[in-house]
C-alpha cells in the first residue's frame, strides 16, 4: 500500500467561513448515503475553492470498509455524565460534512448542492455556520487553540499511522457548546483568567492556575495531543463554540471530556459553569484514497 493522504480541509487554516452539516440516514440507506457522501469528492479535493471534509459514524464506516476501519472505534453513543449531574449529550449522527471557504456565499451554495445530492438518502439533522472572531479568539474573548501543534507536526499526531486499519484517516469529535454570555461577562478579566488558566490579552499560561481551570482540565501532556479547528458560531443572542477536535484515536478526546466533566478529579472544569454542550458526535474521517475506494467499489 502506498501512503494514504488525509482530506486536505483538516489542515486548511485561514478559511473565514464554515458550515457543519450532520446527516441522519433515511431508512435502510446507510451504505448508499456513505457512498454518496464519498462520491461528492471524487478525486478533487476542493470544489470551487471550498474545502470539503467528510466523516462517518464509525460503525457505518466499518460496515462499508471493515478492513479500513480503526479497531474498536465507536460513535458518541452514551452521554458523558459528570459530577453534580453535568451532562455532555450524545447526539451521534451518521455522517458529517464540514465545508470551509473564503466567503459564506460559496460555502452556502456548496452546502445546498451537497444536501440536494444526498436527498432521499440522508436528512440534515444539525446545521451550524461559523466564522472567525478577532483572528483566533473564541467568544469568551480568549485565544482558542494555543496548544495546537504546528501544521508540520499535526499530521503525525492526528492521523492513523500507515499500515494500520484506517491509515491516513483521523477521528473527529464535533461538539456544539452554547455560551452563557451574561454570566461570563459578569466576571472581571482577572476572574475570567482564573477560569481559563491563561492571560486574556496574550494567552500566557498562568503559573498558579487553579486545578479546575480549563487549561488544567484539558492538559494534553496528560491526556494526549489533539489538533483543534474550533470556531465561533451563532447570533448575538445565541452563540458559542463549535469544538472541532482531531486525534489518531478516540481516547485522548474522550479523556478530555471526562476530565472536564469532573470524572477524574471530582471537580469539573470551571469553564463548564459558563458554557454548555448541546451536541456531541465522533466521526471517522477517512483518507482520500479510502473515500475513492468506497465511492467506486460500491457503485453499480
Name each model feature, range by range.
Residues 1-300:
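Long, histidine/aromatic-enriched segments associated with O2/redox biology
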Amino acid at each position: 500500500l502506498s501512503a494514504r493522504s488525509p482530506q486536505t480541509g483538516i489542515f486548511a487554516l485561514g478559511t473565514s467561513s464554515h458550515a457543519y452539516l450532520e446527516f441522519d440516514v433515511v431508512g435502510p440507506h446507510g451504505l448508499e448515503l456513505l457512498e454518496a457522501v464519498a462520491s461528492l469528492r471524487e478525486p478533487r479535493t476542493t470544489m470551487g475553492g471550498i474545502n470539503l471534509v467528510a466523516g462517518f459514524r464509525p460503525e457505518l464506516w466499518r460496515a462499508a470498509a471493515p478492513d479500513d476501519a480503526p479497531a474498536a472505534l465507536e460513535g458518541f453513543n452514551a452521554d458523558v455524565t459528570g459530577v453534580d449531574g453535568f451532562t455532555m449529550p450524545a447526539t451521534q449522527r451518521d455522517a458529517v460534512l464540514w465545508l470551509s471557504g473564503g466567503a459564506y456565499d460559496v460555502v452556502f451554495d456548496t452546502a445546498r448542492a451537497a444536501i440536494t445530492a444526498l436527498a432521499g438518502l440522508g436528512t440534515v439533522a444539525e446545521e451550524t455556520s461559523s466564522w472567525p472572531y478577532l483572528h483566533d479568539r473564541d467568544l469568551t474573548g480568549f485565544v482558542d487553540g494555543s496548544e495546537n501543534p504546528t501544521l508540520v507536526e499535526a499530521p503525525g499526531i492526528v492521523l492513523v499511522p500507515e499500515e494500520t486499519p484506517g491509515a491516513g484517516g483521523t477521528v473527529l469529535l464535533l461538539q456544539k457548546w452554547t455560551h452563557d454570555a451574561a454570566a461570563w461577562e459578569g466576571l472581571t478579566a482577572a476572574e475570567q483568567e482564573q477560569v481559563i488558566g491563561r492571560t486574556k490579552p496574550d494567552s500566557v499560561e498562568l503559573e498558579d492556575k487553579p486545578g479546575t481551570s480549563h487549561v488544567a482540565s484539558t492538559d494534553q501532556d496528560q491526556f494526549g495531543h489533539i489538533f483543534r479547528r474550533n470556531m465561533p458560531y451563532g447570533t448575538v443572542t445565541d452563540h458559542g463554540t463549535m469544538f472541532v477536535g482531531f486525534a489518531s484515536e478516540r481516547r485522548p478526546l474522550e479523556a478530555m471530556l471526562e476530565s472536564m466533566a469532573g470524572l477524574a478529579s471530582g471537580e469539573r472544569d470551571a469553564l463548564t459553569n459558563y458554557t454548555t454542550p448541546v451536541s456531541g458526535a465522533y466521526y471517522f474521517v477517512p483518507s482520500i484514497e479510502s473515500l475513492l475506494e468506497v465511492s467506486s467499489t460500491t457503485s453499480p
